[in-house]
Amino acid sequence: MLKISNYNDLRSSMSPGDVIAFGGKGTFSEIIKWATRAPVSHVGVILQSKLFYDDKSQPGFFNQIIESTSLNGQSGVTITRLSDRIDSYDGEIWLLPLRSDLKQKMDKKKYYDFLIHQERKPYDMPQAIKSALDLIDDAVSPGVLTHNLEDFSRFFCSELVAAA
């Protein structure tokens, strides 16, 4: 886990499938960190876009993040330039690179196709809350109260990242 203090220092080492983790300072972020016993309150995943001019590919790329969150008046799955997201974030940010063996096996076409088709899907607050309570699945009525069924009609942040 690499802490991001300067985006430009890590920009070129980022690649599709890498996870960006956020440790927010707000009340909801603090509740998430307390419930999960982790410094991370939110995650998203890297998309990279090539540069085009006059329908011709140009050298270079820009990093984007796809995430399910409430941001800029929208709630749900959004795609944002990663540099803009980092510049406007109040809290800690980490890069979690995808293991190299998994990068080699990655089917980028399926990865991009899946994620692009999730944009604008709503945020899944009920499942987000249930996921934070997964620790008690086996203690109280195993899985009955907090078990989440796979449902890709809406997403919370880590559900989107895991599905990718």
Predicted features along the sequence, with ranges:
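Short, conserved beta-turn/loop elements at beta-strand boundaries and strand-helix junctions
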Residues: S49-Y53
